Amino acid sequence: MILCDSDIELWMDEEKLDIIPRPPIERINGASVDILLGDKFRVFRGHTTAFVDLSGPKKNVTDAINLIMSNEIQLTEDDTFFLHPGELALAVTMESITLPNNLIGWLDGRSSLARLGLMVHITAQRIDPGWQGKIVLEIYNAGKLPLGLRPGMLIAALSFELLSGPASRPYHKRESAKYCYQQGAVASRIDQD
């Protein structure tokens, strides 16, 4: 069962679902909550790496990721981040989300942005029960023109689905929870698999 707008508000009122800062009622729709783009980004820097061997030794994978990813870029609210056609960047939501053990979240991009070529997530649309932290967005410009993105703009929507029971292995209690509590545009940690 997907939570409707009044249930989303009730779950937040009862502190079962935590979204900080709490969205105003205007951003809580029939079955979703509109979320905002945060102020932290990472991009692929200019490099001469021919490929990243994801099946290679972990140290080599770590070194390759560190070589190709920029340090975190933090914008002010007046700054604009330009994403050019064919470019991928990591960004973060403004909101920090905490899900209880019996609720899963789903991230969807906005249709208005998709119609301009902006993909908000490549494959990572599921937010596991027990999640705590900001959500990293894998944003890609599939359009023909550069797109200017600003912190605080509407970027995506979250919906919430009730599980048949509480998860016995919620995200924040798993040893493999390598992105739990993230607050910035965290680069891939595939080397920790």
From Swiss-Prot:
One Pfam match: DCD
UniProt xrefs under InterPro entries: dCTP_deaminase, dUTPase-like_sf, dUTPase_trimeric
Keyword Ion transport: no
Gene3D superfamilies for this protein: 2.70.40.10
List of catalytic residues: 138 (proton donor/acceptor)
Record SUPFAM superfamilies: dUTPase-like
The organism's place on the tree of life at top rank: Bacteria
Residues that, per the record, bind dCTP: 110-115, 128, 136-138, 171, 178, 182
Metabolic or biological pathway, per its Swiss-Prot or TrEMBL entry: Pyrimidine metabolism; dUMP biosynthesis; dUMP from dCTP (dUTP route): step 1/2
Keyword Magnesium: no
Keywords: Hydrolase, Nucleotide metabolism, Nucleotide-binding
EC number of this enzyme: 3.5.4.13
Gene Ontology terms describing biological process: dUMP biosynthetic process; dUTP biosynthetic process; nucleobase-containing small molecule interconversion
A GO molecular-function descriptor: dCTP deaminase activity
Catalytic activities: dCTP + H2O + H(+) = dUTP + NH4(+)
Family note: Belongs to the dCTP deaminase family.
Oligomeric and partner information: Homotrimer.
Role summary: Catalyzes the deamination of dCTP to dUTP.
Name of this protein: dCTP deaminase
Protein source organism: Baumannia cicadellinicola subsp. Homalodisca coagulata
